Amino acid sequence: MRVKPMFGATFTDIAIWIYYPFNGPTKIRFGLLNYQLPHIGEHIGDWKHVTLRVNNFNGELQSIYFSQHKGGTWLDATDLEFQEGNKAAVYASRYGHAFYSKPGLVLDGRDGIGLRNDCEKDDLYLDTGASYTLVATEYLGSANVEPPWLNYRREWGPTVNHILKDEIDEILKVIPKPLRGHFRKFFYKLPREILEEEGPSSIKTKVNWDGDEI
């Protein structure tokens, strides 16, 4: 957990970072058809986070930022689902771990073509308020003690090289010919983190570590 003042201490941002050991392969939707890609999107290690923005004047939750594959989304507290009183519910997508405020399918694309983000409600969940570690609270001065791993600046996982063209060609074999050109264009517009099988960078090197969420 990383806590920092924002906008002249008008708000306090509480960023909750979660490390996933493995990111699974991507699944895409093409009209009424769904395709599970064999390897694309896989990589060892995956950092994702949600940020709670608290109003320092009244101590109330103002909004939550849900990190996703490319950037993320801010939602006002009035648009969130709460459980057990004041605990906001966050849903992680299957394999990709993109965060959303409700279960169901979110299609990352347009015109019925895109990356599937499937979320489901389950009895198994992670209560981040029950067990957490404060890793960065610079405003506390000398009381701020960072764990050694926080300053590890290299990738949190190996780089695995696959020949993307070969994988695309295999998928094109099962896609109707009139749709193949559209699929190829869509494929190369996927976020970089989906196409590359590379471990994630250190969370401390990310732009939003010190600044606002973008």
Which residues make up each language-model segment?
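Domain-length functional cores that host ligand/cofactor binding and catalytic or interaction surfaces
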Residues: K4-A15, P21-I214
